[in-house]
Amino acid sequence: MNRRAALKTALLPFFAARVRAGASVSTLIGNGSPGYSDSQVNNPYGLCIRDGGLYFCDLDNQRIRRLDLKTRRATDVAGNGQRAYTGDGGPATAGSLNMPHELVFDARGNMYVAERDNHVVRKVDRDGRMSTLAGTGVAGFSGDGGPASRAQLRQPHSIAFGPDGRLLICDVGNHRIRAVHLSTGMIETVGGTGERLPTPDGARLKGTPLNGPRTIVMDHDGTMYLALREGNAICRIDAKSGTLHHLAGTGEQGYSGDGGPARAARLAGPKGLTLARRGVYLADTESHTIRRIDLDSGIITTVLGTGVRGDGPEPDPLQCKLSRPHGVFADANGNLYVADSESHRIRVLTA
């Protein structure tokens, strides 16, 4: 056994003690087989909690669904199950979606959905009517400085509200972050050059290459955190200066570094991000784990998963195997909801 492996083995009881102190994992919905029912999902992705319900992108069912956290009953919010681009101007449940990846709500209760394969961001208003906010339905890059509904996107994956209230879009296929002013409907590029190049530490977001900007989230103070999928890294974006700071990942794909500085750890295609209790939680998809970066110490640890693909067993978080998790969301109590995508489950890690 080499020195690094021996050290990791020696530290495992320490990690386990931290995670197991009252923590357990259980399944909220899903039984391990793909399907569409109150007990089944089919490749869940982005998710969030709102008004007593868990909203999630049921990717291969081409729907947005809501799971009532008390009754455990699932209802449709958007999508009719058909993989297409239809329904603008009508009820969201009558329209078609095409690989919905992530969703977010504004303060008024309107929902926004990033549809990867329609190359659009859709809006579902409080009355359940659907419209297209950004994108034309045709992949490309165009439209900056004009109406977002006439601009082209290429495989948008993630959306979030920035510190100034604009809706930020991770336009992954264009290696850019776009921003839509909701008051005017205009779109612009705020980060990325379109080049698939390494992202330098300490550079300004605007005009800097972004290697696969997959997910962006914002903290209460306006600080943003960005997952670079192809870059295998997490960056912090300063709210005032717009400067990118390298937070985690060496840039090389892998699964290593637990118990040490996050900057020295290897990540494996990070996708979902969420914030809670001075920590950044990430779905490290290709290592089949959920990892935590402590914002005070800079140390990274695994909080769920073993690093080996599988399905359970529960309830021990460090013995429960995952299968390519994509979505992760922390509620106000610190409970962590995980879209265990290819296990066809949504799990919750209780604080």
Predicted regions and their residues:
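N-terminal secretory signal peptides and thylakoid transit peptides that target proteins
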Residues: 1-14
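Gly/Pro-rich loop segments of beta-rich domains
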Residues: 22-43, 72-99, 129-155, 185-212, ...
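Residue-level detector of Asp-centered blade-edge/turn motifs that repeat once per structural unit
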Residues: 49-51, 105-108, 161-164, 218-221, ...
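Conserved beta-propeller blade signature
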Residues: 54-55, 110-112, 166-168, 223-225, ...
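Short loop/turn segments immediately following the C-termini of beta-strands
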Residues: 59, 116, 172, 229, ...
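Short loop/turn segments that connect beta-strands within beta-propeller blades
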Residues: 68-72, 125-128, 181-185, 238-242, ...
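Blade-level signature of beta-propeller repeat domains, shared across WD40, Kelch, NHL, RCC1
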Residues: 326-351
